[in-house]
Amino acid sequence: MGMLRWGVESLQNPDELIPVLRMIYADKFGKIKPKDEDRGFCYEILNLVSRSFAIVIQQLPAQLRDPVCIFYLVLRALDTVEDDMKIAATTKIPLLRDFYEKISDRSFRMTAGDQKDYIRLLDQYPKVTSVFLKLTPREQEIIADITKRMGNGMADFVHKGVPDTVGDYDLYCHYVAGVVGLGLSQLFVASGLQSPSLTRSEDLSNHMGLFLQKTNIIRDYFEDINELPAPRMFWPREIWGKYANNLAEFKDPANKAAAMCCLNEMVTDALRHAVYCLQYMSMIEDPQIFNFCAIPQTMAFGTLSLCYNNYTIFTGPKAAVKLRRGTTAKLMYTSNNMFAMYRHFLNFAEKLEVRCNTETSEDPSVTTTLEHLHKIKAACKAGLARTKDDTFDELRSRLLALTGGSFYLAWTYNFLDLRGPGDLPTFLSVTQHWWSILIFLISIAVFFIPSRPSPRPTLSA
């Protein structure tokens, strides 16, 4: 049924066909499979706990793959501990605070999590530790520091519970995602592929994390509120308290109107980070690092657009509020330069603006929503005016390669057919035949396999 649905969607959206095929290729053949057992486990479990991040991590420059892979797995393990509502607070809080010490302890392992892959990650955690200890001292220092800061922040909020104010909400998101942006910036600089100026823009790194985290928190309402043995609640009381006495009330269809107003205000709050994300991405110098940063941000804006004024958030399941596979693939393979990023953000902002004016014109937060969208549009239009679109150049090169390979294959068969089997020595005939097929296959590879975009000049914020 899934393949049939994808086939129908491809016919309806033919511009998504090639990106989907490229994504399938990356998923099947782009996975890193180290011979070393411990590294092999790390990349295997990475592909299981996060397919989307796994793809972009494995497309990073070689010197960054292991550090970022381990960084992700360490924080995923920490997040699994925080999310496990079966762990008593008296046990969880010290574990969160001390987790940064566990990442260098070869004997540490534990049972936690509600999904088999997360359980397996923590059960076989010594393999992650083994690879962590092979990283450079600077990389280990960065990962340990961010883990410590995140763990302490998570522990603080075990005590605090539901964030009261938007400031509390921002602080929580800083601890669980903003510091990740800071750590990644430090790893980029430590690799030598990014100038140190990036680490001086900590506020922008923080906005990158907050934009992603808030999108996830909004989308995951239904899953979090129904968590057992106790719900997880991250929406700030300052927002939902305007519309309900309890966050769980939004599940009741009788409260749909209030739920939608609350949801739209939550989306509005997340939108204020988008302009800063564009500023951060304009500072990235290495094209592969750019892809790594840009793709999740584009997906987040797309998902946020789906969440806006969408009551499915409160009725579930989470999969109901998800970008189509074709849309995901198209965004993934067209978010490879600043021109494309400005274009995607502008497109999302313009579509949301139309919905604000038609669907939610009476919404209590719509004026603020439109203000944020106008800022995003202005930043994108200014960015488009000063950057070059090289998308067509890449497409033209790919089409030229595919056309040339096809022409050569056709010419070869026509040539051999005209000559006849006895006019050429068998060796030359066979060589010509297989050489033409090889060139044709290479042309197909050039057309489908993801390329490395050319570096962009750094833009002023």
Curated annotation (Swiss-Prot):
<feature type="binding site">
    <location>
        <position position="82"/>
    </location>
    <ligand>
        <name>Mg(2+)</name>
    </ligand>
</feature>
<feature type="binding site">
    <location>
        <position position="51"/>
    </location>
    <ligand>
        <name>NADP(+)</name>
    </ligand>
</feature>
<feature type="binding site">
    <location>
        <position position="76"/>
    </location>
    <ligand>
        <name>NADP(+)</name>
    </ligand>
</feature>
<feature type="binding site">
    <location>
        <position position="79"/>
    </location>
    <ligand>
        <name>Mg(2+)</name>
    </ligand>
</feature>
<dbReference type="GO" id="GO:0016126">
    <property type="term" value="P:sterol biosynthetic process"/>
</dbReference>
<dbReference type="InterPro" id="IPR019845">
    <property type="entry name" value="Squalene/phytoene_synthase_CS"/>
</dbReference>
<dbReference type="InterPro" id="IPR033904">
    <property type="entry name" value="Trans_IPPS_HH"/>
</dbReference>
<keyword id="KW-0256">Endoplasmic reticulum</keyword>
<protein>
    <recommendedName>
        <fullName>Squalene synthase BSS</fullName>
        <ecNumber>2.5.1.21</ecNumber>
    </recommendedName>
</protein>
<dbReference type="InterPro" id="IPR006449">
    <property type="entry name" value="Squal_synth-like"/>
</dbReference>
<dbReference type="GO" id="GO:0051996">
    <property type="term" value="F:squalene synthase [NAD(P)H] activity"/>
</dbReference>
<keyword id="KW-1133">Transmembrane helix</keyword>
<dbReference type="InterPro" id="IPR008949">
    <property type="entry name" value="Isoprenoid_synthase_dom_sf"/>
</dbReference>
<feature type="binding site">
    <location>
        <position position="324"/>
    </location>
    <ligand>
        <name>NADP(+)</name>
    </ligand>
</feature>
<dbReference type="InterPro" id="IPR002060">
    <property type="entry name" value="Squ/phyt_synthse"/>
</dbReference>
<keyword id="KW-0521">NADP</keyword>
<keyword id="KW-0472">Membrane</keyword>
<dbReference type="GO" id="GO:0005789">
    <property type="term" value="C:endoplasmic reticulum membrane"/>
</dbReference>
<keyword id="KW-0520">NAD</keyword>
<keyword id="KW-0812">Transmembrane</keyword>
<feature type="transmembrane region" description="Helical">
    <location>
        <begin position="430"/>
        <end position="450"/>
    </location>
</feature>
<feature type="binding site">
    <location>
        <position position="83"/>
    </location>
    <ligand>
        <name>Mg(2+)</name>
    </ligand>
</feature>
<dbReference type="GO" id="GO:0045338">
    <property type="term" value="P:farnesyl diphosphate metabolic process"/>
</dbReference>
<dbReference type="GO" id="GO:0046872">
    <property type="term" value="F:metal ion binding"/>
</dbReference>
<keyword id="KW-0460">Magnesium</keyword>
<keyword id="KW-0479">Metal-binding</keyword>
<feature type="binding site">
    <location>
        <position position="219"/>
    </location>
    <ligand>
        <name>NADP(+)</name>
    </ligand>
</feature>
<comment type="similarity">
    <text>Belongs to the phytoene/squalene synthase family.</text>
</comment>
<keyword id="KW-0808">Transferase</keyword>
<feature type="binding site">
    <location>
        <position position="322"/>
    </location>
    <ligand>
        <name>NADP(+)</name>
    </ligand>
</feature>
<dbReference type="Pfam" id="PF00494">
    <property type="entry name" value="SQS_PSY"/>
</dbReference>
<comment type="function">
    <text>Converts farnesyl diphosphate (FPP) into squalene, a precursor for sterol biosynthesis in eukaryotes. Does not possess botryococcene synthase activity.</text>
</comment>
<dbReference type="InterPro" id="IPR044844">
    <property type="entry name" value="Trans_IPPS_euk-type"/>
</dbReference>
